[in-house]
A protein has these predicted regions:
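Sec-dependent N-terminal signal peptides
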Residues: 11-17
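Generic structural signal for beta-strand residues in well-ordered domains
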Residues: 19-21
Length: 197
């Protein structure tokens, strides 16, 4: 499974300021003075995050489920034993950080909304009816819904996780339809999108 991180950046729209400035110039021709006071709150909106537990860089990693060769027994998948642990770690965030929400994005399985489907084209040697789920290690049976921005369905960091600057996660290979899982290669990509307050 390849894991990416994506940072959301906020930008201040300047079109409103341009429109206000243009209307102010037009009014000046009529000898009318307008005083405009702008009030703004400037926030530091980005954090630096990294992944720990797989192979690769801090922001793009490959996580192997199974043995060193990525081999997993069919029974292990069906018994929820085909897993790999990893973490998202805060490297640097503003001291004012009070809320951190993470959406797990990818191509969801049509049978399992919490699973990211196999990205390999169906065919000989490719696993079918398989997906990978991502959950907290402390709540491994409650995976996040893929692409959901609803707080109840995505990773909302607790105060303790923010304070510890880390959230331990588990990726689990799952069967998406009972008695349908086929053996073969499996690859999936998850992207983590962050919202900060």
């Amino acid at each position: 499974m390849r894991v990416y991180m994506k940072r959301n950046r906020l930008s201040l729209p300047i079109a409103a300021f341009v429109a206000m400035a243009a209307s102010g110039s037009a009014l000046a021709a009529n000898s009318t003075n307008l005083d405009v006071n702008f009030t703004a709150t400037i926030l530091e909106t980005t954090c630096n995050m990294k992944l720990v537990g797989g192979q690769g860089s801090d922001t793009v990693q490959t996580l192997t489920i199974g043995n060193a060769n990525g081999e997993v027994r069919l029974d292990d998948v069906r018994n929820n034993a085909a897993t790999a642990n990893f973490q998202i770690v805060i490297v640097e965030c503003p001291a004012s950080l009070s809320s951190l929400k993470t959406t797990v994005t990818g191509t969801p399985s049509g049978y399992l909304l919490t699973g990211i489907t196999n990205s390999l084209a169906k065919g000989t040697g490719v696993s079918d009816y398989s997906a990978v789920t991502i959950a907290r290690q402390t709540a491994s049976t409650t995976p996040f819904v893929i692409n959901s921005t609803a707080d109840a369905e995505r990773l909302v960091w607790t105060e303790t996780e923010i304070s510890n600057k880390s959230v331990p996660l588990v990726a689990s290979l799952q069967e998406t339809k009972a008695s349908s899982l086929t053996v073969g290669r499996f690859e999936a990509t998850a992207v983590f999108e962050f919202e900060y307050d």
